Design a protein with these regions (language model features):
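ABC ATP-binding cassette signature C-motif
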Residues: 1-184
């Protein structure tokens, strides 16, 4: 598959295979096209050439580097309730607490939370969806050390496949069983 913009490839063609247990780290310095690869895999950008296909039974969850909340003038409880209307308030509070969003943090407007707290809410929402593939673009952005450790602990317990873009080698090397280096 070739990736790029406006019909121009930004990388040489890439190719890799995964199975249901692959935890793949897309490794490379900033600006080489790792996010572009993920966006192309997710069909948010067209491939310049070739294609990437998933098994028909794939259930994919994707967290982008740039967080997108439809309405940032709601709190975490409301966001989760709108995203998962069948979840009880108690279950929402329990799930938010697991990612460190407790008490008053759960009722503050998302726009008033730190970047790390917003990441935690997105991760909490992501973890509620049934999936067998996680695609994560810099999931540790804005997280403190304890939150990073909790995230990677949860990812290690995840039984599906993972495609990870991260500049956190300490965590990525422990988590991933396959590395794909992006180089020019």
């Amino acid at each position: 598959m070739s990736v790029g913009y406006d019909g121009k490839a930004i990388l040489p063609p890439i190719s890799f295979e995964m199975d249901s247990t692959t935890k793949l780290w897309l490794r490379g310095t900033n600006g080489l096209g790792k996010t572009t690869i993920l966006k192309t895999i997710m069909k948010r950008l067209p491939a310049i050439g070739g294609s990437f296909t998933f098994n028909i039974n794939s259930k994919i969850n994707y967290i982008e580097q740039d967080l997108q909340f439809g309405n940032r003038d709601v709190n975490a409880m409301t966001f989760m309730n709108e995203t998962y209307p069948k979840m009880s308030q108690k279950d929402i509070r329990t799930q938010l607490a697991k990612v460190g969003i407790k008490n008053d943090l759960a009722t503050k407007f998302i726009s008033n939370l730190s970047g790390g707290e917003q990441v935690k809410i997105k991760l909490c929402a992501l973890m509620q969806k049934e999936s067998n593939i996680l695609i994560l673009d810099e999931p540790t952005n804005h997280l403190d050390v304890s939150a990073k450790e909790a995230l990677f602990e949860a990812l290690q317990a995840y039984e599906g496949a993972i495609i990870l873009v991260s500049h956190e080698p300490l965590y990525a090397e422990k988590l991933c069983n396959k590395i794909f280096d992006i180089e020019f």
